[in-house]
Every structure is written in C-alpha cells, then in structure tokens.
C-alpha cells in the first residue's frame, strides 16, 4: 500500500459562521470530537503537523467557524460529495455508464459517469487524487452530484454511483441533516451544509495501521511500542528483573504480576466464593467453575474445556504427542507438569509436607489426599448408595460396581477388571513379577500397596483410627470392615439363603456351604476343608504325630500325652 504523506488539511472540515449556526449542539460536539481525534491520530503517528487555528479554537472551547474565502475553486468546482440518503435521492438525478476504475494513491475506486459534458472536466486521476488524497476513507456509498446540471433534469431514469471496493460500512445519516421545511428555506446553505456535515461525520480518516513491520517475521503493528515488545521475542531481551529472585521479563506488566508471588498480593477476588487471585486472567478462568462455561471444544471427540491449556493437553491424547521428555530416563509426557512431577522420582524431592504427621510427598495432590486421612473428609459421594470417598478417582472406580463395567481385560486369560491398576496387578500373576521389595526383610510384593501395608508390620504404624472407639488399624480396609461393627451394616448378602454379612470374605466362606466347595486340601491325608484356617488347624495333628513318632515315648508316658482334638470339617 502506498505510504503517501497525510496532511491535516486532507481530513479537516471548515465551516463559515453562517454554516456553523446551522449545526445543533449534538452536531457541533460531533464535529469537535472528530476534528480533535483526527489531529491527535496524525500527531501520534509521527506526522509533522503544525497546530491549525481551528484546533486551537476547539481546544479552548471557542467557536471554530472560519471566514469563508470566495473564489477558491478546485479543478472540478461543480462537484461535491454526499452519501446516499433517501431524503436527497428523490430530488437529485444521476447518470450512469459502464464502470471504470481509477487508482487514487493505492485505492481503487469504481465510479460511473454517463453525462458527456461532465466527463472531460472531472474524470482525471489528478482531480480524484487531489480531492481524496491517499488516505483510507470509509466511503461505502458515495454519490457524485452536479450543482448546475441536476436542477435541469426532471426524470429519474439515470442512476450514477461511485463506490469503493471497501463495502465494510453503510452509513445511515438521515438524522444528520435539517428537516425538509428548513432545507427549502435555505437552499444555498443546504448544499454546503450537507456536504460538510457528511464529511464531518463520516470522512473520518483511517490512516493505514500496518505501518510498522518486524524485519524478522514480517508481522506488522500500528504502534512502535507494540513492535518493540514483539521484537524481544526474537532478541530474547528481558530488561525487567525481579529484585527478589533475579528472574527477568520482557514486559514490565509481566514483572508486576510476578512480584505478587513474593508479596502474596491477590487483588482479583471472585464475587461468588471470595477466592482471590494474583492475575485477572486466573480469576476469569476460575469463574468458569461457577458458570460451568466450557468454551474450548475438541474437534475430535467434542469434549469441552474451561481453559485452552486443558484443551491443548487433551488433544495430545488423539495425536499421541509427548513433547516433554525426561533427560534422566527418556520417558516422555504430554504436558510439562507431569514431567516435573516425574523428575522428583530421580531427585527424591518431596516438597509437600503434612503439618500433622510430617509425612512428605512429591506432589501437592498427594498431600491433599493424605490430609483427608487426618480430617476424615470424604467430599466425593456416590449418588446410588451414598458412599463417600476421599478421592474422585475412587468414586469413579466405585461407580463401576453399580454399572458392572469392567473395561480392562487381560490379554492372557481374558479376565476383566473395573480398574487398570487391578489389571496391572493381575498380569503379574502370569509374569511372576514382584517389583516391590521390603528393605527390612527382603520380602517382595507384586504391588506397592501390599508393600506399604507390609512395612507397617515393621514400623507398627496404624494411621487409620475409628472415631467411635479410637481403635487403630494399619490398613484402611481393616478400618472400613471394623466400622461395620458400630453401624451394623451387612452389605454382602447370600443369593441362595439371603443371609447377610459385614465382610465379603465371610460371604465367600458361607457360599461354600451351598456349593460344597472345599478348596484347601491336606497334603498328608488328602482331606479337604472349606477354610484355610481349618486346614492349618488340621495340619497340626500331623505335626504332633510326627513329633510323637520321632521322640518314641514309652507306654507309660504315652498315656500321659494329650490326645489331639479332631476338628469338625
């Protein structure tokens, strides 16, 4: 686009005293606003402009009308510009011919003219260029009218128009002009007033905004300050440093936000829950929790998210992209936070410490879940059975009990599981893998939870306490079972006889009465039992018999030995 210089005279509209008196207060205010804004726009763009007298008068609040200079006529004095208006189109005749295009600066203007006597004087490029200049002007529907010819023509079979290719605005200016009665009384002033009133309202200059171009990436800006900030992306310049931690930033606004980390300032507060934030953007994201708004939708699966960052992370599920790689072991992750958490495995860092028991965790989420052991908080409740859980993941897993869903299947034996963790543990039955070893006794386990439970046998730790009787347990499952003593809950019912039990293991043992199953067999006598405890008791008989045989007691002493008591199987 051409960058011809724009002068204030190109965009200024001057009124004589007589014309100024025609304007009502609203129109005069509009004139002041447009004139001052155009002047300031040129100054802000670095255009060398000496302050015109009319601007000085406007700034002082004085009447800006100018003494009209007679006898100054342009190259085509018989023409004026007005915007298409239904009030005037009925009185003004127009003429048409095939469309032509003339270049004015860098603007391509389409115009039509079909009156022979008008062509020679008014269709030169120099005339248009003199009238419009090279600035961009929103002239969506511009009509050319001729003062001398039009009154002589009475028919309405011609139509002429001069339109720009920029059809972005259609102006409605019917209310900008005097009523018909006043217009007829002051016909000489009407044309001049009409022209300048339209120019005042709509001949607002939009100087080419893309004036400043980045030499590295060709991106354009309308302000030098924006370009300067942008160029720091390429140069890496970060001139704003935090005096607390030395971290640097490319923008002062980013430094101001960062400082709130040190000061703890959180000036942006949610009106719903009173939660405060250090940045307005964080508040905006948080408010979607209350409104439920999820404006970012995945094109693949239509899942919606409240934050664009969450959508970006989710899309990697479809693409399989894992751009964040651990430099220690090469494991890759779909987002940076997962990598940061993973790296603590290598460093052993556990920055999150429980203020009750002092236990430390590598992830903040683990600490929050752990603290619910102390508080007893279970915020996630099942709508089916009202059972509550301390973690949402546990609720999701539990709900599969009601739905019967078992989406995770073993490829070896086709056994299905409701949780992927159960599948992982099960697969170790086939592989024999026991990766979790106790450092105290060397005993190995197939899953970490079993190791954690086992280690409490060495430490004596019993973190799970019954609120009713203060009895403690090493396992949460043990506490859950114990609490049924107080509640009387018996959720496990036999589908044969209807008898109910508080423990699933008790139901399993009971059902063997109906099925006749005796899975525990003695290796010595092949006798079988329904329960492992019964088998263990029975095996002591053989142990005692072996002891008696080896010791070879005399008949007198043998009568004094206790007789083994048989167990009813």
From Swiss-Prot:
Provide the family line.
Answer: Belongs to the krueppel C2H2-type zinc-finger protein family.
Q: Where in the cell is it found?
A: Nucleus
State any single GO MF term. Answer: zinc ion binding
Q: Does the keyword Acyltransferase apply?
A: no
Q: Which keywords does this chain's UniProt record carry?
A: DNA-binding, Metal-binding, Nucleus, Repeat, Transcription, Transcription regulation, Zinc, Zinc-finger
Q: What is the lineage of its organism?
A: Eukaryota, Metazoa, Chordata, Craniata, Vertebrata
Protein name, UniProt field: Zinc finger protein 583
Organism of this sequence: Homo sapiens
Q: Show the ranges annotated as biased composition (Low complexity).
A: 549-558
